Design a protein with these regions (language model features):
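Canonical Radical SAM [4Fe-4S] cluster-binding loop centered on the CxxxCxxC motif
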Residues: 7-45, 58
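Generic intrinsically disordered, low-complexity segments enriched for polar/acidic and small residues
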Residues: 5, 13-14, 28, 62, ...
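A detector for short, charged/polar N-terminal pre-domain segments
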Residues: 1-7
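Conserved alpha-helical segments that form or flank metal/cofactor-binding pockets of metalloenzymes
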Residues: 68
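Radical SAM/AdoMet-radical enzyme domain recognition
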Residues: 44-65, 73-132
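Glycine-rich, flexible loop/turn motifs
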Residues: 4, 38, 126
Length: 132
């Protein structure tokens, strides 16, 4: 099995798509926080419209779903399906990993190219302190 990761280089095009601001954690370093950003969630129609804007370059674009915590979005599975149908080069979900089982219940491995998990410390104590 060939090891792969999303290419973050001058030659690659990466679309970082924040589909909601809500999160299940309160990480000390996070730039998206409840006080500033509230709990906004894009509708599936809005997600489809935005993806449509970039669809002409989809075959050359790595799509990364972000948040907040994207696994909290009620239509994440549908958004992944829409992106797949548009032919994006790769589809990634960037997650804190706490709701990983929810992803596996709704999205098949064939629909997704990568998961990106954040780890915020080398010990449980450090990780938990940072994540609030």
């Amino acid at each position: 099995m060939k090891k792969q990761t999303v290419a973050f280089s001058r030659q690659s095009t990466n679309l970082f798509f924040h589909i909601l601001t809500r999160c299940n954690l309160r990480c000390a370093h996070c730039y998206i926080n409840r006080e500033q950003h509230g709990s906004n969630t894009l509708s599936l129609d809005t997600i489809r419209e935005w993806l449509g804007i970039f669809s002409s370059k989809a075959k050359d674009t790595n799509l990364i779903f972000l948040g907040g915590e994207p696994t909290l979005h009620p239509d994440l599975a549908s958004a992944v399906s829409i992106a797949g149908a548009m032919g994006f080069k790769s589809i990634t979900i960037d997650t804190n990993g706490f709701l990983f089982h929810n992803i596996l219940d709704n999205i098949t491995p064939a629909q997704l190219d990568f998961f990106s998990f954040s780890l915020d410390g080398v010990t449980k104590e450090t990780n938990d302190a940072i994540r609030g």
